[in-house]
Amino acid sequence: MSNYVVAMEAAWLVRDVENSDDAIGVAVSEAGKRLNDQDLDYVEVEAGVTGCPACGEGLDAAFLAANTALVGLVLELTVFNADSDEHAQRIAKSEVGGALRDVPLEVIDVIEDGDAPAEEA
């Protein structure tokens, strides 16, 4: 059994905001609060980055229209003692998905973590 770092992308809807910086701040705060309420404080929440189609430069993953924003968030956690990377993905989506109901989640990266000590089963 191995440990895996699983990164997921979440689409977070924020209403009544006037700029993308405010939308990102609200999205990160709300996601963090919902995760912490479910004792998932080990999940890291960050604003997502998307590449500019013209130049490839990284841009904040936030789209704003009519004072409503869709913010892309990156959620990252370590899954201990998983049988495979697919097993780690299922565990991560189950843990985070339970706290963030009705929030679309997609696994974007899974890395086997050889540095983290395995927890006792």
From Swiss-Prot:
InterPro entries: UPF0212
Pfam families: DUF555
Chain segments annotated as coiled-coil in the UniProt record: none
NCBIfam families in the record: PRK03922.1
Family per similarity comment: Belongs to the UPF0212 family.
Protein name: UPF0212 protein VNG_0879C
The species this protein was found in: Halobacterium salinarum (strain ATCC 700922 / JCM 11081 / NRC-1)
